[in-house]
Amino acid sequence: MIQQESRLRVADNTGAKEILTIRVLGGSGRRYAGIGDVIVATVKDAIPGGNVKKGDVVKAVIVRTVKERRRPDGSYIRFDENAAVILKNDGDPRGTRIFGPVGRELREKKFMKIISLAPEVL
């Protein structure tokens, strides 16, 4: 459950290490975001020479959350950290590599490029 001011790790090679959520997209009253939801965020920590710099405002999709999520078959999935992948304006990932596992919910939300780049889909 990601909300405004939540900090997330960045799970790609764009150069950002940490982002802070500005807004959860998907309606005016939307408060929380889960795996597969898109957020607007600002880069809080970045490595020098990366594609994004500290202070940049970016769109990102959430790929891992600590809060468990119930699946249709009754099972639950949760991760050890909150993480996101930075997106371009057309919805494709800005980086060329994804680090760590991602949730299967991304497939239902049509983020196929992230699914194909990820080392593991849980």
UniProtKB/Swiss-Prot annotation:
InterPro entries: Ribosomal_uL14, Ribosomal_uL14_bac-type, Ribosomal_uL14_CS, Ribosomal_uL14_sf. CDD domains: Ribosomal_uL14. Keywords: Ribonucleoprotein, Ribosomal protein, RNA-binding, rRNA-binding. GO terms for cellular component: cytosolic large ribosomal subunit. GO terms for biological process: translation. It holds the Pfam family Ribosomal_L14. GO terms for molecular function: large ribosomal subunit rRNA binding; structural constituent of ribosome. Part of the 50S ribosomal subunit. Forms a cluster with proteins L3 and L19. In the 70S ribosome, L14 and L19 interact and together make contacts with the 16S rRNA in bridges B5 and B8. Binds to 23S rRNA. Forms part of two intersubunit bridges in the 70S ribosome. Belongs to the universal ribosomal protein uL14 family. This is Large ribosomal subunit protein uL14.
